[in-house]
């Protein structure tokens, strides 16, 4: 077991009940283009086209051969683009059950399948995009390979579902997915979990590792740091546990599996719980009559790293397993800094709220202050469990010093790895955005 002591479990109200329920009927689904780092689409459909489930919607011209497929059958009703014609989303009005089918196999055949057969089926179905590289967090090139694949079979994000509930419901598919991953690499498959019991693969290159401690103990970046540190030469891939199930379902049934169990939770959700929906589901449909009155912000993903789901982005993200909802914090409190703050959370124990152990807080979207200078008072070190100098690294990200940032470990990181640093920052800096700018520059300059 690997135990980390630094980190932070956010005490936010609205914890979901850990029972899986059926979600609302979904009328629209979408693929969100901006989720895929560096992707430049070549469109295969236009508005008005009828599509089958698993039909190709677009390919990536910067990563030749990588296909992005429809999560449901229906009619393309929107192709939304932003500044500089960046693809925001392809929206499908759900209708019918037609789907593209693929080869299916017996469970005993999976570990012996040829690697090219596996790659071809994953690419054609669109499931290849479930894999992400580290560094850079991009969809792997089809001809690339890795010696380490990390399966994130735990989740320490605030308000998250317990993965063991979902995995144990789909044990056969999960084991089949691990068998597929084991055949996809000449190295090891690291299944990273909490102390719970999960179905195990019989393949010799599949290892289980237990992590314990506060968030970010459940992040792929934390697991890689301790088990297979990445750099420009050592490239690892990561995948979440629900996509491992989808891999198994694809090869066992010959059909694309797009079901997703998500946590619908937060301080303004009427009945926080786990709901079964589909990848790309309209969050307007999913949250209909589920929220308390007032102005709220629906977030696809965690409250720490998710995206504001509004307009062309109001859909469940490809890599997200949560829908979090917060109240918009627009009210201003006179002399709020001088109040005892019984109902306020503070990492630095600035408010009385820290005295009441176990208290959950109705957090909002407010940043509790305006932008200001970066102040190194030890906050970053409290929440960074990785063996690096967070204050120096964050300073270099602010200054745009890519050489120094790379030397301090920036290539190991993804935006989610710096989310707690953003949360505890007195200067209100968005370190995830700064990290992405740094990584883009490093990749561009080689």
Curated annotation (Swiss-Prot):
Q: What is this protein called?
A: Na(+)-translocating NADH-quinone reductase subunit A
Q: Which organism is it from?
A: Vibrio alginolyticus
**What is its biological role?**
NQR complex catalyzes the reduction of ubiquinone-1 to ubiquinol by two successive reactions, coupled with the transport of Na(+) ions from the cytoplasm to the periplasm. NqrA to NqrE are probably involved in the second step, the conversion of ubisemiquinone to ubiquinol.
EC number(s) stated in the UniProt entry for this protein? 7.2.1.1
State whether keyword Heme applies: no
Q: What is the lineage of its organism?
A: Bacteria, Pseudomonadati, Pseudomonadota, Gammaproteobacteria, Vibrionales
* Subunit description: Composed of six subunits; NqrA, NqrB, NqrC, NqrD, NqrE and NqrF.
- Which catalytic reaction applies to this protein? a ubiquinone + n Na(+)(in) + NADH + H(+) = a ubiquinol + n Na(+)(out) + NAD(+)
GO biological process assignments: sodium ion transport
